[in-house]
Swiss-Prot record:
Name of the protein this chain belongs to: ATP-dependent helicase/deoxyribonuclease subunit B
Chain's role: The heterodimer acts as both an ATP-dependent DNA helicase and an ATP-dependent, dual-direction single-stranded exonuclease. Recognizes the chi site generating a DNA molecule suitable for the initiation of homologous recombination. This subunit has 5' -> 3' nuclease activity but not helicase activity.
Note: Despite having helicase-like domains, this subunit does not have helicase activity.
Organism: Streptococcus equi subsp. zooepidemicus (strain MGCS10565)
Keyword Nucleotide-binding: yes
Encoding gene, per UniProt annotation: rexB
Cofactor: Mg(2+)
Quaternary structure and partners: Heterodimer of AddA and RexB.
Highest rank taxon of the organism: Bacteria
Family statement: Belongs to the helicase family. AddB/RexB type 2 subfamily.
InterPro entries registered for this protein in UniProt: ADDB_N, DNA_helicase_suRexB, P-loop_NTPase, PDDEXK-like_dom_sf, PDDEXK_AddAB-type, Restrct_endonuc-II-like
Alphabetically ordered keywords of this record: ATP-binding, DNA damage, DNA repair, DNA-binding, Exonuclease, Helicase, Hydrolase, Nuclease, Nucleotide-binding
PANTHER family registered for this protein in UniProt: RECBCD ENZYME SUBUNIT RECC
Pfam assignment, any one: PDDEXK_1
Length: 1073
């Protein structure tokens, strides 16, 4: 074994490539080994250093891949399971285990995160040359017992599928021990680059290869100064030193110092030497020069967005200087927090990029399809699962409009479960659903699903055949291809990887579970688990892209220009978190009991060494310029400066406060089309910034003027979102079509209430005609109709029968009507509602029998009230009562408590009773009032009554009173009836004021409606909260941010409130006149 080390200012790759080439020229086969995370980049750099740009004798690869070269022929019929297959194995094991078989993990059997932990533990035990039986020092013996149970059954399933139970490295080690590879290995040389530690499995293999191979060459970056030190704890090179010294001791060889022809910029090595002195407690008699400080700089930005925009502008500047995208590298302190923002910002500046990170498949439509299919079977055709299955776009060939209609009908008819899905749709409503079309869609959905779901317990291979037949029937492959074809090229590459993973999971299922009997539910659950835990990685379509990855995966001298962002204290240094099933303390205890070449990694014990090594690589990652950046605000929370950056600042590395991106006329701002257009749109929205220079201000003013002129020529305009709740008027021709000018505008009291609640709600409901989802289940409207019908029959009954008999007969008759039978006898919920309503009817109806001097003149009386040629008000009055003197009163049944509030009426929110009075008055009828009757079952607190006597009955009847507007002149006729007269009596002139103001409310609304401009203005009573309908899903109204758009109601003090409102009404009426 040959151990090489060099200063970080030299190229270890060049040194090792030179060694590899020398052995290749002698006829040896050379394997150039790099870590998994660096193998792709290392292969490119190695090939670039070879004079012929390639070699058949030199293979750049990883340990595991190298093992395949030697063992592939000997294990041709056996494959290794990938992570997706292992997840399916463990899920199957946990499904088969009973709860009492697991003492610690029994509650986690179906937990996806637990299964992922088992997969990682299984692989980690393989790399550590351990089994679950070796975990003897866990905190709880029951924990080891559970792991032994799970791992043993998993290995049995793996053997059942004839998959490899050992790793590739273990197979190679066994082959070496058997002497079957001696001839090949004698002609083999290993060159190992980029490592600072080996796993136990790699150490064992390395020891065997050292005896069998011609040579093993290992290189590492270590300064000569560090190598000569006796005490290395906390040294910047501690990880590399420990690595090389341990190998030197084990294999009895002396490390050799060497150099490369290539020498990188001394500014980075000088910075490294100063840092090294800080960590080994020595001193240097020189400082960073001006040239050194120009090569390394620290940026401080306001937030992540500003930070990324500064980076993209800097990249574009480098492009103008003649560099290429592949010369740039962006390193992220925290990939997860930056990943969502990178795409939009880099695309705005038209910078191609590649993020070297595995992505989960869980959000892909194919995974959602599999999840919905499994849930549809498990939950017996639950509606939302079937709808999600169809909305994935992968089931059959349906038009979007057809699926919308089907979903609306499923909600309306409450189609749940196989029984309802299997029967023809027959129920309909006033909306007249297209039942023939819907039944065609139903058959297209139900037929293939029913064929699949009726599968009985059988072999996994047979179930998979049925599943493949189902996929063919619904045209899954064609639909997936159409879906991928409609997406961007980058997304199409992701789709290809997802499809490969999906087919791989099906193949694994067939191999492992093909000969095992199981139910369809278990089959789908296994495939779903494989899909949910799967990840994919795409490769860049071209090499000329900006590479983006986590900063802890970088190696020295990676790219000419490196931008490391997000280097806050929270992420630099990176704090390793142990999320496995075995704690660090347990790992350390296990390692004390194991033999050589058996070891579990203990992340926290090596954290400091690893972080120093990462910082060393990061500070030397660039060959020309290095930018280290941190946002002062990271994901909406402030963060402190990294201790490593504090060291650099103390050494004199300059800090630049980047601040907010300012618009200028520099090449970075105007040299890219999308970025230029984006800035012009921003200026159009926000105006020219005051802090611009006069030259910048002039440039952008002229550019914006020019763009607007060009857009006007094309009949286009710039978007403006600064007032996101500002609405545009409806086109006059649309208003004319919807509300013809030669006809009066049709209104109702409920439409007027909606208008004054929120004008935009009126627009949605009465102009666009949008409707809320309806349901076959009875709602408040149906309940009201039911009680109305009962009261109507009771009041029409002129027989001499007792009132209770009349009421019972009316209830029985209404219950037999088909419209009510359909909704109240369909299920238990409907029958329960019916019983509640019958109780309300029995409680409320007696009030009809109390006013013997009153006659019911009419019921369900329709009316039309014309307000000149401007408006026609239509409505239906529930009941009209008549006094003995012929005067009429209006009764409106309500299912909830309602009173006439003059303040609500003044603000347009309660015009119903006054509108009804106007309709009767218009016919020349005398009036005595208009009132609400709350249909209810009175509820009283018995604790309020000392004695349960007649007072309880009187209190119950007190709740059942008519409340509304009454004429003072009719008081003598009403005093002995069930009327609430306190503060509800109005003189004739006051009633005239109400009627006149009511007309003004209608005419004002008509005038606004005719303009076609509908405001988003839900009302607020207190100016602090919004009570009107905000329609958040449509308008994006946020009460705390958009309170200024709300319509403020007029609220007056309680003292003499009624008179004050009447006075205001009179004043406004006179003003209009």
């Amino acid at each position: 074994m040959k151990l090489l080390y060099t200063e970080i200012s030299y190229s270890m790759t060049e040194i090792l490539v030179k060694e590899a080439r020398a052995y290749a020229d002698k006829g040896y086969r050379v394997f150039y080994i790099a870590p998994n995370s660096l193998s792709f980049e290392k292969e490119r750099s190695v090939l670039a250093l070879l004079p012929e740009q390639g070699s058949f004798a030199i293979t750049v690869t990883r340990f595991e891949q190298m093992a395949r070269y030697f063992t592939l022929a000997k294990a041709a019929n056996r494959q290794a399971l990938d992570d997706n297959g292992l997840a399916m194995i463990f899920y199957r094991v946990l499904m088969q285990l009973q709860e009492d078989e697991l003492k610690v993990f029994h509650r986690l059997r179906t937990d996806q995160a637990f299964i992922a932990q088992l997969v990682e533990l299984y692989k980690e035990l393989q790399a550590a040359n351990l089994t679950a039986f070796d975990l003897t020092t866990l905190d709880r013996p029951e924990k080891q017992e559970d792991l032994i149970t799970i791992m043993t059954k998993a290995e049995q399933l793996i053997a059942q599928g004839d998959y490899d139970q050992s790793s590739r490295l273990a197979q190679l080690a066994e082959a070496i021990k058997s002497k079957s590879l001696d001839d090949e290995l004698r002609q083999t040389v290993l060159v190992i680059d980029g490592f600072t530690r080996f796993s136990a499995e790699e150490e064992q293999l390395l020891a065997l290869l050292n005896e069998a191979c011609e040579e093993i060459v290992i290189g590492a970056y270590i300064s000569q100064k560090a190598y000569r030190l006796a005490f290395t704890k906390g040294n910047l090179y501690e990880a590399s030193l420990a690595f090389i010294q341990q190998l030197a001791q084990q294999f009895q060889t002396k490390p050799i110092y060497t150099t490369s022809e290539k020498v990188f910029d001394v500014s980075f090595s000088r910075l490294t030497q100063l840092l090294e002195a800080n960590h080994d407690y020595s001193q240097l008699d020189w400082q960073l020069s001006a040239k050194d400080k120009s090569k390394v700089v620290i940026w401080q930005a306001l937030n992540q967005k500003e930070e990324l925009e500064h980076v993209t502008k800097a990249i574009r500047e480098k492009l103008y200087q003649g560099y290429r995208y592949k010369d740039m590298l962006v390193l992220l302190g925290d990939v997860a927090s930056y990943q969502l923002q990178i795409g939009p910002i880099f695309e705005k500046f038209e910078i191609p990029y590649y993020i070297g990170k595995q992505e989960p498949m869980s959000a892909h439509p194919l995974v959602q399809f599999v999840e919905s299919l499994e849930r549809g079977r498990r939950y017996n055709w639950r509606r939302e699962d079937i709808v999600n299955l169809l909305k994935s776009g992968l089931f059959g060939r349906f038009q979007e409009g057809e699926l919308d209609q089907l979903e609306q009908y499923l909600v309306f008819a409450d189609i749940q479960g196989f029984t309802k899905f299997s029967r023809p749709f027959t129920l309909n409503s006033s909306r007249q659903y297209p039942l023939p079309l819907l039944n065609q869609l139903r058959l297209a959905v139900v037929t293939p699903l029913q064929q699949l779901f009726k599968s009985q317990k059988q072999l996994g291979a047979s179930l998979l055949d049925k599943l493949m037949t189902f996929f063919k029937t619904i045209q899954l492959a064609d639909n997936f291809e159409a879906l991928a074809g409609s997406r961007r090229e980058a997304d199409r590459e992701k789709d290809e990887e997802v499809w490969k993973t999906f087919t791989g999971i099906l193949e694994t299922f067939y191999q492992v579970f093909g000969q095992e009997k199981m139910t369809l539910a278990d089959c789908l659950a296994l495939i779903k688990m494989g899909m949910q835990t799967a990840h994919y990685r795409t490769v860049p379509a071209t090499l000329d892209v900006v590479s983006i990855k986590s900063y802890d995966l970088v190696e020295p001298h990676s790219k000419p220009f490196v931008f490391a962002i997000g280097l806050s204290r929270s992420h630099f240094p990176k704090q390793t978190k142990n999320t496995s099933l075995i704690s660090d303390q347990e790992r350390a205890s296990i390692n004390e009991q194991t033999a050589s070449y058996q070891r579990l990694d203990v992340p926290s014990f090596e954290n400091i060494k690893k972080n120093h090594q990462t910082a060393l690589s990061l500070f030397n990652a660039a060959t020309q310029e290095l930018v280290l950046s941190l946002p002062t605000s990271l994901t909406n929370s402030s963060d402190d400066v990294s201790p490593y950056l504090k060291e650099l600042i103390a050494l004199g590395v300059p800090v630049i406060e980047k601040g907010k991106n300012r618009l200028s006329h520099s090449a970075a701002d105007i040299g890219n089309y999308k970025a230029l257009l984006s800035r012009l749109v921003a200026i159009n929205r926000q105006g020219i910034a005051d802090d611009m220079t006069s030259e910048d201000r002039n440039f952008w003013t002229v550019a914006l003027r020019y763009l607007k002129r060009r857009l006007a020529d094309e009949q286009l305009s710039l978007p403006a979102f600064e007032h996101h709740l500002t609405t545009k008027p409806v086109a006059p021709e649309v208003i004319e079509t919807r509300f013809p000018s030669q006809q009066p505008l049709s209104l109702s009291s409920s439409a007027l209430t909606v208008f004054y609640n929120n004008q935009y709600k009126y627009f949605l409901k009465y102009v666009l005609g949008l409707q809320e989802p309806e349901s076959i289940h009875p709602d408040a409207r149906i309940h009201g109709q039911y009680l109305h019908r009962i009261f109507e029959l009771v009041t029409k009954d002129r027989s001499n029968a007792a009132f209770d008999q009349k009421l019972g007969a009316a209830i029985a008759a209404v219950n037999q009507q088909s419209a009510f039978q359909q909704v109240y006898q369909a299920d238990a919920e409907g029958r329960y509602s019916l019983e509640v309503l019958k109780g309300i009817a029995y409680s409320t109806a007696p009030v009809l029998n109390l006013n013997q001097g009153m006659q019911v003149a009419k019921q369900e009386e329709a009316f039309e009230l014309a307000l000149g040629h401007q408006a026609l008000i239509r409505g239906v009055i529930d009941r009209i009562d008549q006094l003995a003197d012929g005067r009429l009163g209006i009764v409106d049944y309500k299912s909830s408590a309602r009173v006439f509030d003059i303040g609500a009426f003044y603000n347009g929110l309660s015009p119903q009773l006054v509108t009804y009075l106007a309709a009767l008055k218009n016919k020349g009828q005398g009036l005595f009032g208009a009132m609400y009757l709350h249909m209810q079952e009175p509820r009283l607190s018995l604790s309020d009554f000392k004695v349960l006597d007649d007072q309880l009955v009187a209190a119950a009847y007190k709740e059942l009173t008519y409340k509304g507007i009454f004429l003072a002149q009719a008081k003598e006729y009403l005093a002995n009836g069930s009327y609430h007269l306190n503060n509800t009596l109005y003189e004739t002139d006051e009633l005239e004021t109400l009627l006149a103001y009511n007309e003004q409310l209608y005419l004002s609304a008509v005038k606004q409606i005719k303009t076609g401009h509908f405001l988003i203005n839900p009302y607020t009573a207190d100016g602090k909260s919004v009570q009107g309908d905000q329609l958040k899903a449509i308008t994006r109204f946020e009460a705390d941010l958009d309170l200024g758009y709300a319509r403020r109601l007029v609220v007056l003090p309680a003292k003499e409130r009624r008179q004050a409102f009447l006075t205001r009404m009179n004043e406004e009426i006179k003003h209009e006149d």
